[in-house]
Curated annotation (Swiss-Prot):
GO cellular component: actin cytoskeleton; sarcomere; Z disc
Protein known as: Myozenin-2
Family: Belongs to the myozenin family.
Organism: Homo sapiens (Human)
UniProt modified residues of type Omega-N-methylarginine: R53
GO MF assignments: actin binding; FATZ binding; protein phosphatase 2B binding; telethonin binding
Modified residues (Phosphoserine): S101, S116
A Pfam family per the record: Calsarcin
Length: 264
């Protein structure tokens, strides 16, 4: 009787034989698909679907860029022809590469020779020179619009009264009437006796004031008006005292020493 291990091996061999027949003999194992997707693959997969708005905008932009992209098919065809001719003539050979000699890269056609002086016809074909015969444009001239005059204005152009009625004007201020020349005593202060008797110079005396020193108690009272205010929070003081410091003695009141008499 076969053991359990041999039976499992036979079943595995049968399963592998069936898988080879289904997928072919070249396949060694099962294709389990992609295990990990990088962010770039995920982004390209999302842009390939047209379900979201961003993918549609990306496709429109790609089509627009392809529309305005210029591809030089003529240059590519010429390069292929030159390469095929070189292959036929035997110019391209592997022995040159083995010897260490390297060929110069093929230059595109219609490339001017850098050793020769530049020719304007090669750089820009069709350019013959500056346009000296054509006068330059006048950019600084100001275009004045044409004035339009309606038929009504043409009909009443000869009548100034109708023109004034058509275009109302602002009212002009009326001229001020001449006021009588009255003398005013309100604006100028006239001294007693007139200006002749008044002194020509106005004398001003600076008032005398006493400067207080910084150490003066009166100055300190101005700086800190609460300095002379009585405080009941820290040290108890009497009601009659004038902020006189109270001296508290620390000596004991009871005398512990007993006096001795002459008899003892």
């Amino acid at each position: 009787m076969l053991s359990h291990n041999t039976m499992m091996k036979q079943r595995k061999q049968q399963a592998t034989a069936i898988m080879k027949e289904v997928h072919g003999n070249d396949v060694d194992g099962m294709d389990l698909g992609k295990k990990v997707s990088i962010p770039r693959d995920i982004m390209l997969e999302e842009l390939s679907h047209l379900s979201n708005r961003g993918a549609r905008l990306f496709k429109m932009r790609q089509r627009r860029s392809d529309k305005y992209t210029f591809e030089n098919f003529q240059y590519q065809s010429r390069a292929q022809i030159n390469h095929s001719i070189a292959m036929q003539n035997g110019k391209v050979d592997g022995s040159n590469l083995e010897g260490g000699s390297q060929q110069a890269p093929l230059t595109p056609p219609n490339t001017p020779d850098p050793r020769s002086p530049p020719n304007p016809d090669n750089i820009a074909p069709g350019y013959s020179g500056p346009l000296k015969e054509i006068p330059p444009e006048k950019f600084n001239t100001t275009a004045v619009p044409k004035y339009y005059q309606s038929p009504w204005e043409q009909a009443i152009s000869n009548d100034p009264e109708l023109l004034e009625a058509l275009y109302p004007k602002l009212f002009k201020p009326e001229g001020k009437a001449e006021l009588p020349d009255y003398r005013s005593f309100n604006r100028v202060a006239t001294p007693f006796g007139g200006f002749e008797k008044a002194s020509r110079m106005v004398k001003f005396k600076v008032p005398d004031f006493e400067l207080l020193l910084l150490t003066d108690p009166r100055f300190m009272s101005f700086v800190n008006p609460l300095s002379g205010r009585r405080s009941f929070n820290r040290t108890p003081k009497g009601w009659i005292s004038e902020n006189i410091p109270i001296v508290i003695t620390t000596e004991p009141t009871d005398d512990t020493t007993v006096p001795e008499s002459e008899d003892l």
